[in-house]
Amino acid sequence: MSMEKPPLASGLARTRSEQLYETVAADIRSPHGSMDANGVPATAPAAVGGGGTLSRKSSRRLMGMSPGRSSGAGTHIRKSRSAQLKLELEEVSSGAALSRASSASLGLSFSFTGFAMPPEEISDSKPFSDDEMIPEDIEAGKKKPKFQAEPTLPIFLKFRDVTYKVVIKKLTSSVEKEILTGISGSVNPGEVLALMGPSGSGKTTLLSLLAGRISQSSTGGSVTYNDKPYSKYLKSKIGFVTQDDVLFPHLTVKETLTYAARLRLPKTLTREQKKQRALDVIQELGLERCQDTMIGGAFVRGVSGGERKRVSIGNEIIINPSLLLLDEPTSGLDSTTALRTILMLHDIAEAGKTVITTIHQPSSRLFHRFDKLILLGRGSLLYFGKSSEALDYFSSIGCSPLIAMNPAEFLLDLANGNINDISVPSELDDRVQVGNSGRETQTGKPSPAAVHEYLVEAYETRVAEQEKKKLLDPVPLDEEAKAKSTRLKRQWGTCWWEQYCILFCRGLKERRHEYFSWLRVTQVLSTAVILGLLWWQSDIRTPMGLQDQAGLLFFIAVFWGFFPVFTAIFAFPQERAMLNKERAADMYRLSAYFLARTTSDLPLDFILPSLFLLVVYFMTGLRISPYPFFLSMLTVFLCIIAAQGLGLAIGAILMDLKKATTLASVTVMTFMLAGGFFVKKVPVFISWIRYLSFNYHTYKLLLKVQYQDFAVSINGMRIDNGLTEVAALVVMIFGYRLLAYLSLRQMKIVT
Ligand SMILES: Nc1ncnc2c1ncn2[C@@H]1O[C@H](COP(=O)(O)OP(=O)(O)OP(=O)(O)O)[C@@H](O)[C@H]1O
């Protein structure tokens, strides 16, 4: 970046990415460094040893050279992979370094062993300490580091003149809103890019866009990954941590990460290896102490906010992503935990990953940890470059803090157009005096709009063009490596059946508390007992008794039609956020999820009605014989599954609980009224509605089971062979589910 002021001494130090370019270039040139179709080097990660043995002394010396890292007067000995990477820079010309580069160079290995932080900064550093992460014998070349994931493809991300517009529909018209305007920049493996800006400036939008989560039709400009456009293949190489932690509240930390590992890691790993990876991530993130604690949510006490955020990050780093994007990973965390999180991102970057994070208001300690910075204001670019040079740049355009200020606070004030305690450039002052009064606030200071306009213009005229030119430089990867990012094929972690099994078990675990909810059991059993008492040993030898018992059968049909609809409508709207997140990451096929979600509730759906029917059947004196008992039970099951189908369909179509409950109550009421008990003479033009009612078919089947031996018609209902009713219920079971599935397919993945 060209600036009027010379860059600070720290800015002269090469960034980690610049140093690492050389390593990757050496690696790619190296015969050992060629990658296979999966972006995996042809050689297995070389054992650390032989000529490449990392000596503690050299490691210490190299850490001293690391820009942006204070070594604490040599007391903080960093023994992480980053040190190993840096050592390679020194040794790159030697054969030993080249052979080791094939496994450990930029982007080709993933091992962020611990979270280095100067001890003077954080006292309680135990969970993040890397002191024990790489034992002595690793340095001696005997053992691999604790966490050694398979190598990945490095991703060089460039974006040029990115724009994003949305159309906001109003009652009579629609308005176009520009959310991002002409944003350009780049981030390389080994770097952490921070996106900063006031609330609503477009950080999340830009992050989603860079993650490939916004449809290209509404965006302008170009975003390239290794100089190639986005492809579905990249989904499995990109980790995206959303601002809100979307996790299942009733799963423990270990269960959450183990299921993520089993679903997302490639088929080439065994189940045991995947479990081990989850345990490694737990250790890396310092989550051992809470690994068996439930995540928790609004109604369940669980892990702390910081731990939950780390689980969210773990969910993404478990796949060993080449590009990791995080939306406000530090919001809501105390400053120490926030710093730990950012240090962790550094370690991830140092393992050769490209890291982008939005950040709201970092402390000055955090601010200095970022390699690059993008400052946004009202969707426009106010600064892109090294974060260490940001203050120099703004002072070069006449904006400097007048009092001692956290640099992040200063930048955010500027981006907000708030120039209290900030020196105003004379150019801006002149403009205000010459310009109209609207550009000036009552205090005589330029308005926020005028400040914004000045900053955008200053960046455009002084920096933007040179930065854009830099984007034209080809990335230091050979064509073969670049081509890997353009492969169109998605990569599923596991086969369909395994996805189904994992999702089924996960569903059972997440809802286990519902299955054994005493409230629900009490609700069903007390209803059964009340029915049993009201219809106690009912006598059907009189017409009145028969009529009474028919009423009981109708109530059973209504009760088991009503109950499942209202439980099932919650299924998809409640899991919408999770479904969105997991489908955006291509974790599983929708069909596997759908089937697992709809079948994992079945055990409960059979236990409770069975208990209910046992109580009611014998208390009320229905036909005591195994055959009618089991047929009645089967009829109730058919009714439950059909009713559930309707609930699932309504939930999936509307995806909104309020709307879904309203529609469900109207539908259920209509079906109940058309069920054949309350009204017998229905006008012809509306009589067809009964055929849609599962209550009607269930009632007819229950009547048949009880009275087929001595009656042809009961209560105006003809008793026939019952095949039509069974067929109608079966059609409903599949039809409603198909409708629900198709609606989910149509659902847009919102990011
Ligand atoms: N689909 C959309 N429809 C309408 N407005 C949108 C849409 N997406 C984003 N916006 C608007 O774009 C602006 C930027 O939103 P974005 O969420 O990217 O901001 P942000 O910088 O991440 O804010 P915060 O820090 O508060 O999360 C906001 O004003 C938001 O309301």
Curated annotation (Swiss-Prot):
InterPro entries: AAA+_ATPase, ABC2_TM, ABC_transporter-like_ATP-bd, ABC_transporter-like_CS, ABCG_dom, ABCG_transporters, P-loop_NTPase. The chain crosses the membrane at residues 516-536, 552-572, 602-622, 634-654, 666-686, 722-742. ATP binds at G197, P198, S199, G200, S201, G202, K203, T204. GO terms for molecular function: ABC-type transporter activity; ATP binding; ATP hydrolysis activity. Residues 498-707 form the ABC transmembrane type-2 domain. PROSITE patterns: ABC_TRANSPORTER_1 (PS00211), ABC_TRANSPORTER_2 (PS50893). One of its GO terms (biological process) is transpiration. It is a multi-pass membrane protein. Keywords: ATP-binding, Membrane, Nucleotide-binding, Transmembrane, Transmembrane helix, Transport. SUPFAM superfamilies: P-loop containing nucleoside triphosphate hydrolases (SSF52540). One of its GO terms (cellular component) is membrane. Residues 26-81 are annotated as: Disordered. Residues 157-403 form the ABC transporter domain. SMART domains: AAA (SM00382). Its main location: membrane. PANTHER family: ABC TRANSPORTER G FAMILY MEMBER 22, ABC TRANSPORTER G FAMILY MEMBER 28. This is ABC transporter G family member 22. It comes from Arabidopsis thaliana. The gene is ABCG22.
